[in-house]
């Protein structure tokens, strides 16, 4: 029998596949692309492209579904129409992009590079331009020699890939272990040596003395305190930091011996995660009203504040436990740096230092914005902070030095402004940097890059997108709450992924901004505060003292600045939502879906908590949404079935409010056009409230559709309303269905979304990235020089062009 020859199959490009399809299904493809072209000059998003397909005759749809073109179409994220051309950005899988352009006059297909596609896209705004030089940003050359995975399973698990690669590189022979020895010998805190002293000069001595220590420890009782053998260990070169008891020290020593003998990534991560490396943490969140009381619902003040306050308490608990278990007597410190607001609007935002409730060593440290004229007194929108941040960074550096009497071990940035300040500080101080986006505005506002000039006066996106690019490329590691935030899903583009290639016409063109396969990305999901948010079934913990206040909020016949409209039928289940009142949160969208759906209105009441009608808003977007809400109430005659409650700032009572909605057998709806994570989704599910949430962003990952909640498409509100009506109809006939979804949500939270899991992971990541930064070229010096130039030549002039706030 002849040996079968191995056949190598070449993967065809999108252009070749489209060429083949045009031969096989020429008429049908031409008909569809002609529909797209007929829309005229402009951009069609993925859902609009699919809508054009679904508007075709069923017979044509059927033919196309049977061929390769349909898969191509499903992968097309946008279409650029400049008749007779249609260009398509095709995404066969997360993080992988190809570009093609079709000439509909002669049905010629050409493949484009990212730069060519972006240049074509710019013609929508600037027309055809010849000879004009446009700055192109490309970070790819700096990463050419740096390893990165190609499999989707590694997206968001960068530390595992990094450990695999660098452990193989560093530990391939005994000589290559010297960087680890050097790291352990140099490791110290405030001048005090940790781990190893100068009695250990080489690897042979290290291994020999570790074995001696192992033999000695095996003779001791496991609970023997480190202090009882500290001097003996110092004589053989071992300092504090290995553990507080004989058992823990022995485990740590064995981990290192295993690494020296047969290194593997898992052992390496465990060892690095236990080295005492994090004692002082600085967290940056400049914008908004950052305080602990009476601020939620103020402009630019929402989930991020809650996230950080929960984060620092969990971090402190984990740091204290680790420091104790490492056998150290060091007091940790966590500083949340935000803006000091002299006009504090009845909050503590004018106070320099504020202790975080429920913590021992966490403080909010406020530093004012200032100009040459002095301190800026008033609140400033997050879209207008850019001209103040460089001076703010210098002032923050001085305040940190004063408070900590030294440098922090970790700097964490939050949102665009906090991440830029974190980048500047980390660069200045040489400290490990972590980035948390919370939300990247480019994703929230479709086409805000290509049409940035139209939006810049109001939003200053040119500054913000530039700051985002600088921060995400400067940072040591990025943590996200979900995979969606990084690389989206099969059908939706991730927040970070949308920064891979884009253009700001007339400013610069980003050919390669960020790669979702970069090992700096790690998914570390937060949770809800379990002392506030817990299941409605935990009767003994229920805060029934709030029930009279909650009933007043929901059912009072009084209409005032706190609650507008009344609920006539108090026995109906309640659809509940709570968020800031802005365009992207889409609360007015939910009200409109409800208003239009007669069946849903008969089944349930709607309660919306958002916006503050008790005072005049300073936020233009909130004003516009308020106006829309009033109009919807009148248009759909909602009074009697709808209640609009001003923002509620008491988190403890809000926790009981979720549980009270559970008692009505209601549901929580998160209708955002895009949501990076969805903390309110986690809060609602933690209380056992069945949840319907946007399919765009993090909630699509938090919720397992049909099991622990439901996904809804905010761009198809009619279908979302029908989905809600179907759920409540089913619950009416089978009450156990409500219980089933409620329990599914609770189980989902316990397995993945708790602050304890979060804090353990964050500290381990800090240790791992801090080590690799020390012993390898992970600090990416070349790209940081590139970023310095980009900051000075592009960001700074853009920031200086943003008008300063008018002070009366």
Swiss-Prot record:
Function: Sucrose-cleaving enzyme that provides UDP-glucose and fructose for various metabolic pathways.
Stated pH dependence: Optimum pH is 6.0-7.0 for degradative reaction. Optimum pH is 7.0 for synthetic reaction. Optimum pH is 9.0-9.5 for synthetic reaction.
Organism the protein comes from: Arabidopsis thaliana (Mouse-ear cress)
Tissue occurrence: Detected in the whole plant with highest expression in young rosette leaves and roots.
Known EC number: 2.4.1.13
Catalytic activity from the UniProt record: an NDP-alpha-D-glucose + D-fructose = a ribonucleoside 5'-diphosphate + sucrose + H(+)
Recorded phenotype for the gene knockout or disruption: No visible phenotype.
Gene Ontology biological process terms in this record: cellular response to hypoxia; response to hypoxia; sucrose metabolic process
Family assignment from sequence similarity: Belongs to the glycosyltransferase 1 family. Plant sucrose synthase subfamily.
A GO CC term assigned to this protein in UniProt: vacuole
Description of what induces expression: By anaerobic stress. By hypoxia in the roots (at protein level). Up-regulated by NUC/IDD8.
Bridged cysteine pairs (disulfide): none
Protein name: Sucrose synthase 4
Superkingdom field: Eukaryota
Location of the region described as GT-B glycosyltransferase in the Swiss-Prot/TrEMBL record: 277-754
InterPro entries listed in its UniProt record: Glyco_trans_1, Sucrose_synth_GT-B1, Sucrose_synthase_pln/cyn, SUS_EPBD, SUS_N
GO molecular function, one term: sucrose synthase activity
Keywords linked to the UniProt accession: Glycosyltransferase, Stress response, Transferase
